Amino acid sequence: MRINPTTSGSEVSAVEKKNLGRIVKIIGPVLDVAFPPGKMPNIYNALVVQGRDNEQTNVTCEVQQLLGNNRVRAVAMSDTDGLMRGMGVIDTGAPISVPVGGSTLGRIFNVLGQPVDNLGPVDTNTTSPIHRSAPAFIQLDTKLSIFETGIKVVDLLAPYRRGGKIGLFGGAGVGKTVLIMELINNIAKAHGGVSVFGGVGERTREGNDLYLEMKESGVINEENIPESKVALVYGQMNEPPGARMRVGLTALTMAEYFRDVNEQDVLLFIDNIFRFVQAGSEVSALLGRMPSAVGYQPTLSTEMGSLQERITSTKEGSITSIQAVYVPADDLTDPAPATTFAHLDATTVLSRGLAAKGIYPAVDPLDSTSTMLQPRIVGEEHYETAQRVKQTLQRYKELQDIIAILGLDELSEEDRLTVARARKIERFLSQPFFVAEVFTGSPGKYVGLAETIRGFQLILSGELDGLPEQAFYLVGNIDEATAKAMNLKT
């Protein structure tokens, strides 16, 4: 860790004497800068543009190419309006560095690690560069272990891997934000962990809504900011491509500190990973690289790998990443989502049909998948229960057309029993969330994996066939469902 040269006035003045360049060309967010012979900055160094009277501007750039003739090409992290040829540029001698540690919790940052929430400066001198190598193989924790979320449908049917990567697929209004906030809340309570949210190329309105909802639900503690459970890093879609391309690395750098130094389990959200690829494509075109398939950058796999390989478990702690994935034109073979899928351990698909039925979380039990759902990892009992639940729901799905046309009475006795159990399972997959308490008035429930398996086994065995299906709706464990059934009878 080191003090960030871009934020320390004394260091900037020292660097200024050594290595001052001049802008020779400006093309949108791309600057060409000439330096004295023998004083060329390294690739990824941060450059700070000086104003007319040698005052520092707010424009920081990152070196991307060495052009020859003592010139470099850099990409700006903010608007280049007002810049002119001949302006001075300071080579800071290091990559962009951002604040890390507990003081980042409850705050909102931009790509440079500067707070943008009007709550004053961040109380820390510890910073870390956003460009780092992935952990060495010897540091990795290779044990396959389940990351328990306390959410029944996730833990049973598409379990998350500790230190794994999960793709979150869902449109607007199906409960993606609430699911994200519940995961942030549960990891803090059950694992003593923290979360980092990276808003990559998202709408400013959505970022603002998320911040306000987090304050309302207590994920961000307004009374005592350091007691918050999440740090937010935003690079909105109105910002230059350089900022959108690097904001994911800023969020990841903050998460790495919690993993490596504080030895915590960290949850890293990236919304949306497609925007990271899109920003890289824009930068690639601006730098004059020849486009690859479908117009994407030729370095697509390398850029994705450099981000994804840093998201992993080490012997100190873990970073479990949940990434929202936008699929352009619903084409799963598009290079951007196809490259992302290669890195995912699990997919959580949110269904508009389930949301319309009022079943929350609206996770589709048949479309969601996980590489962890294997007998040798989760055990025979968990695997068998999950498979039987899926088989029952699949059979119910197949029978729905017959039910719609002919009605339940035309089904065989066995199929009627399957439908009754499937409807109970569907409702039991719903669950009241802690972060939704302020909206629903129902207390949130955290359900352990063993309790989840026991509940579904009882439904599948037929022991609860006599209970009404509404008793299983929005409850925690199976004991609450039986108690609710008794209340319904009285």
UniProtKB/Swiss-Prot annotation:
In which organism is this protein found?
Ipomoea wrightii (Wright's morning glory)
Tell me which HAMAP family the record gives. ATP_synth_beta_bact
Biological processes annotated in GO:
proton motive force-driven mitochondrial ATP synthesis
Q: What does this protein do?
A: Produces ATP from ADP in the presence of a proton gradient across the membrane. The catalytic sites are hosted primarily by the beta subunits.
Kindly indicate whether the keyword Nucleotidyltransferase belongs to this entry: no
Q: Which Pfam families match?
A: ATP-synt_ab, ATP-synt_ab_N, ATP-synt_VA_C
The catalytic activity of this protein is classed by the Enzyme Commission as 7.1.2.2
Spell out the SUPFAM superfamilies in the cross-references: C-terminal domain of alpha and beta subunits of F1 ATP synthase, N-terminal domain of alpha and beta subunits of F1 ATP synthase, P-loop containing nucleoside triphosphate hydrolases
Q: Which reaction does it catalyse?
A: ATP + H2O + 4 H(+)(in) = ADP + phosphate + 5 H(+)(out)
Tell me the name of the encoding gene: atpB
| Name of the protein in question | ATP synthase subunit beta, chloroplastic
The terms under GO molecular function for this entry are: ATP binding; ATP hydrolysis activity; proton-transporting ATP synthase activity, rotational mechanism
**InterPro entries per the UniProt record, alphabetical:** AAA+_ATPase (IPR003593), ATP-synt_VA_C (IPR055190), ATP_synth_F1_bsu (IPR005722), ATPase_a/bsu_AS (IPR020003), ATPase_alpha/beta_chains (IPR050053), ATPase_F1/V1/A1_a/bsu_N (IPR004100), ATPase_F1/V1/A1_a/bsu_N_sf (IPR036121), ATPase_F1/V1/A1_a/bsu_nucl-bd (IPR000194)
Q: Which family does it belong to?
A: Belongs to the ATPase alpha/beta chains family.
